[in-house]
Amino acid sequence: MIRELAGAKVFVCPEEGPSLADYANLTGLIGDLYGAGGVRLMAIPLARLGPDFLRLSSGVAGEVLQKLVNYRFQVAVLGDVSAAAAKSGPLRDFIRESNRGSSVWFMDDLAALEAKLAAAYGKA
């Protein structure tokens, strides 16, 4: 579903659905969004990215995020990553560095994403 958050058009992936860690599913979604006009930010629930997404050595996070960024999408991964980050220094560093940039963000929920967008774009 496409929503406007702090003036930005955001595609909010439903919680339920096929894994976006699957190449065909992710590519299909990218194709669909190219026809949606003006959507440049995807909010993806962590559950849709598969169990290996937060295990950096699996390569899933890199593959998924790089594909989306290559297609010029900003990505917000929605969900609690604190337990996984507490167990992995590299993951914690990756999340921290991602959140400092503008391409990939890890947010607890849509409200946190909206607050980040409002701060970034000066909209309340």
Question: Whereabouts are the PLM-identified features?
Answer:
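Amphipathic, Lys/Arg-enriched alpha-helical "gate/interface" segment within cytosolic domains
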Residues: I2-A124
